[in-house]
């Protein structure tokens, strides 16, 4: 393929990879996101993968990034426009430059629970280990610390945008603003009581409050967007699903949920509801471009 041929032309030299994280302007308080910490910059690399057009690998190219965080140009190192001659330059020989990666699903604060209970069936893992641990430990400080650690790990390995779904989403959003990472903050809804809310109704009420808190253009310009996050078909009732669908349409935000994650989930759903989880959501009108389904390993 074109991609394989281009990559082959890189030769056998060892290379490093740089991920290009585009900061965006904001009037918020975060020092990491203020314009005084940015400057006009040209990054020259041995290879640039722009993602679009698909399969393209540009050899000996540069990317110009203006101080407001936007890409001002992509051009050959040897043929740079005069407009960029007085910009700061960063030289990356034998290195590959590409856009930041996207973590499309996660629970960042749970980094603090890494290794807490491994290699268990999902139902056992959740009910006997994770949910009891969350009931004991999760609070705003736990979420702030765990999310900060996760963001540090993501940024250090090239992930510059994340989709997060966890309790205390207002804390998650504030932490993302402080660090400068882009994020979709998915507002959790689950029928079980937890440290964030007592029931589905309270989850939805709090979700709407968090949406109002972070819906401004200032937050969107800083890379923060929102979604509803009903946990999964087996942890959310039809009544709550219908309210979530109504609000998501009114507010024009997506819905993000676990679906068809395990074989037992599907078997249990058929036994209890006489239909598979996907069919249940379809019957309620959920299938649309705004639906984000994660895992989907048991179709």
Predicted regions and their residues:
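Intrinsic low-complexity, disordered N-terminal segments enriched in polar/charged/small residues
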Residues: 1, 6-8, 13, 20
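N-terminal metal-binding scaffold of metallo-dependent hydrolase/deaminase domains
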Residues: 14, 18, 22-83, 96
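Divalent metal-coordination and catalytic microenvironments
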Residues: 46, 63, 69, 94, ...
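Short beta->alpha connector loops
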Residues: 48, 162-169, 234-235, 296-299
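Alpha-helical scaffold segments that flank or form the walls of functional sites
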Residues: 96, 114-181, 203-220
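Short, glycine/acidic-enriched loop or turn micro-motifs at the edges of active sites
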Residues: 106-108, 167, 261, 298
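Metal-coordinating catalytic core of metallo-dependent amide/deamination hydrolases
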Residues: 172-297
């Amino acid at each position: 393929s074109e991609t394989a041929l281009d990559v082959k032309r890189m030769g056998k030299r060892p290379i490093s990879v740089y991920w290009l994280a585009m900061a965006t302007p904001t009037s918020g308080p975060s020092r990491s996101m203020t314009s005084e910490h940015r400057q006009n910059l040209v990054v020259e690399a041995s290879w640039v993968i722009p993602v679009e057009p698909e399969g393209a690998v540009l050899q000996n190219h540069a990317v110009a990034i203006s101080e407001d965080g936007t890409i001002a140009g992509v051009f050959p190192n040897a043929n740079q426009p005069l407009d960029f001659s007085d910009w700061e330059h960063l030289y990356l020989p034998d290195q590959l430059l590409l856009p930041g990666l996207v973590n499309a699903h996660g629970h960042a604060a749970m980094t603090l629970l890494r290794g807490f209970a491994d290699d268990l069936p999902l139902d056992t893992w959740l009910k006997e280990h994770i949910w009891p641990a969350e009931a004991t430990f999760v609070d705003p400080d736990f979420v702030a610390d765990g999310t900060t650690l996760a963001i540090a790990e993501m940024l250090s390995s090239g992930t510059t945008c994340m989709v997060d779904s966890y309790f205390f989403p207002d804390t998650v959003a504030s932490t993302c603003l402080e660090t400068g990472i882009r994020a979709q903050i998915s507002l959790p809804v689950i029928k079980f009581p937890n440290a964030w809310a007592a029931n589905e109704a309270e989850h939805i009420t709090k979700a709407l409050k968090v949406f109002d808190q972070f819906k401004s253009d200032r937050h969107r310009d800083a890379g923060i967007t929102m979604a509803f996050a009903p946990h999964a078909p087996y942890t959310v009732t039809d009544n709550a699903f219908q309210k979530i669908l109504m609000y998501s349409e009114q507010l024009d935000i997506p819905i993000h949920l676990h679906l068809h994650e395990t074989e037992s989930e599907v078997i249990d759903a058929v036994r209890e509801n006489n239909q598979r989880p996907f069919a249940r959501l379809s019957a309620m009108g959920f299938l649309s471009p705004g639906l984000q389904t994660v895992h989907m390993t048991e179709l």
